[in-house]
Amino acid sequence: MTDILAKIAAYKREDVADRKRRRSIAQLEAAAKAANSPRGFKAALEADHAPGKLALIAEIKKASPSKGLIRADFDPPALARAYAAGGASCLSVLTDGPSFQGADGYLIDVRAAVSLPCIRKDFLVDPWQVAESRALGADAILVILAMIDDAVAADLMSEAARLGMDALVEVHDEAEMERAGKLGSTLVGINNRDLKSFVVDLAVTERLAVQAPSDALLVTESGLFVAADVARMEAAGAKAMLVGESLMRQADVAAATRALLG
């Protein structure tokens, strides 16, 4: 685990312990059951992918550890509507506060503003967070293999399935892709960003895609800025892309989204 992930995992475990003290599992389960039904995150990506076109998971992100503040004019519901107007298939909403200036309320507000499926972009280290994600309205969760062992990953995926949610399993290298296959992952995200140097290289997707489970829908993450990047990733075998920073920095988010999708 890299230093940044170790730091995040440490504060996230403390945060989860505090949240558990304030909210019983019974209360959480009741809230999860009361939430609107999951919208089908993976199904939306499958429906929107076509030859020559990647489905888009558009990310709502105010800041990041590597880039600092990304968008000062930050209105999650308005951004969600702009992404929807631009043709996004799904949305990714950052809810981590310390590293990304996210908030749980952003996910609630975004899901109320649009009809697109939403993934909660956070750092999950405990199955309790999966039920919490469903209670917040999330349709999918992120499982970062660089941060957890296979036992925890399996528990997160099982809990997501129980609650009718999809799990996007994120990998960064060959060893993690092999783990994703053994875990039975059918929605795999390849992060093109090196978590130690923060350098982004689209060749990571090209290298790892050939090792992906044959039945997995591949999502390429980070480093896509122009239509040529999209075409390159589709040629590598990706069926969807997760894009945040390059769109968040645009004045006209809807127009930028349309341009990226071609």
UniProtKB/Swiss-Prot annotation:
Key word Lyase present: yes
Reaction(s) this enzyme catalyzes, per UniProt: 1-(2-carboxyphenylamino)-1-deoxy-D-ribulose 5-phosphate + H(+) = (1S,2R)-1-C-(indol-3-yl)glycerol 3-phosphate + CO2 + H2O
EC number(s) stated in the UniProt entry for this protein: 4.1.1.48
Molecular function as annotated in GO: indole-3-glycerol-phosphate synthase activity; phosphoribosylanthranilate isomerase activity
Keywords of this entry: Amino-acid biosynthesis, Aromatic amino acid biosynthesis, Decarboxylase, Lyase, Tryptophan biosynthesis
Pathway participation: Amino-acid biosynthesis; L-tryptophan biosynthesis; L-tryptophan from chorismate: step 4/5
GO biological process terms, semicolon-separated: L-tryptophan biosynthetic process
InterPro entries: Aldolase_TIM (IPR013785), Indole-3-glycerol_P_synth (IPR045186), Indole-3-glycerol_P_synth_dom (IPR013798), Indole-3-GlycerolPSynthase_CS (IPR001468), RibuloseP-bd_barrel (IPR011060)
Family annotation (PANTHER family): INDOLE-3-GLYCEROL-PHOSPHATE SYNTHASE, TRYPTOPHAN BIOSYNTHESIS PROTEIN
Family (UniProt): Belongs to the TrpC family.
Protein name: Indole-3-glycerol phosphate synthase
Gene of this entry: trpC
